[in-house]
């Protein structure tokens, strides 16, 4: 995925014609607005020849005015892929469950996989490798941290979450990352100590 992203980034900056998604449609559900997410998905999909359709909070009352099952079936009939930026993580799970087309998790309150893919891509670009990176995240133990922990179950790293004691990440996600025995995971409440443990510092 990272190699493909690097190749596409090069083609984009060189203004090369790349119409892989010609005659394809992306439905973008934004229950939670974001300028960066909208601009990146919409620009990228249209550059690759597709059409991106924006649906804001007032267009769909997902899980309220509109049943998620019905919305999922509607998009599956008219579109080729869905990107959803939602609050409730269960909603993205249900959306994918009833969908017959790919569903991209643009963000939920639980995790933010696209952000972490971008972060690890940036690390790879600047450092030339993602082999055992030493990373410290400073901030609340939020959806960003949960996605880092999920990535730490797949590639080896030293990951430290430095957060206030009352704002720790989800205990179950921490334990799964530790139990995977792939990465070194630790939780710190001392910023000065934490920065000594890593080469890469991330904060919100």
Where are each of the predicted segments found?
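Positively charged, low-complexity intrinsically disordered leader regions
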Residues: 1-39
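Anion-binding alpha/beta catalytic cores of soluble intermediary-metabolism enzymes, centered on
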Residues: 16-18, 73, 80-151, 200
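Active-site cofactor/substrate anionic-group-binding motifs, chiefly glycine-
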Residues: 25, 30-77
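Short, structured coil segments at secondary-structure junctions
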Residues: 48, 98-100, 155, 181
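NAD(P)-binding Rossmann-fold cofactor-contacting core
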Residues: 155-178
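Short acidic low-complexity segments
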Residues: 181-197
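Residue-level detector of conserved catalytic or cofactor/ligand-binding positions
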Residues: 198-204
């Amino acid at each position: 995925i990272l190699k493909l992203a690097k190749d596409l980034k090069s083609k984009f900056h060189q203004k090369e014609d790349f119409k892989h998604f010609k005659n394809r449609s992306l439905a973008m559900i934004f229950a939670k607005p974001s300028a960066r997410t909208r601009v990146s998905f919409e620009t990228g999909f249209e550059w690759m020849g597709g059409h991106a359709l924006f649906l804001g909070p007032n267009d769909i009352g997902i899980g309220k005015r509109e049943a998620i099952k019905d919305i999922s079936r509607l998009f599956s009939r008219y579109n080729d892929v869905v990107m959803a930026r939602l609050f409730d993580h269960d909603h993205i799970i249900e959306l994918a469950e009833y969908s017959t087309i790919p569903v991209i998790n643009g963000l939920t309150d639980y995790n933010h996989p696209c952000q972490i893919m971008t972060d690890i891509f940036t690390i790879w670009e600047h450092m030339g490798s993602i082999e055992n990176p030493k990373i410290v995240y400073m901030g609340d133990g939020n959806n960003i941290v949960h996605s880092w922990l999920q990535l730490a179950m797949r590639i080896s790293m030293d990951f430290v979450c430095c957060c206030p004691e009352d704002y720790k990440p989800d205990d179950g996600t921490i334990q799964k990352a530790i139990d995977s025995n792939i990465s070194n995971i630790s939780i710190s409440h001392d910023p000065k100590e934490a920065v000594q443990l890593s080469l890469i510092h991330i904060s919100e």
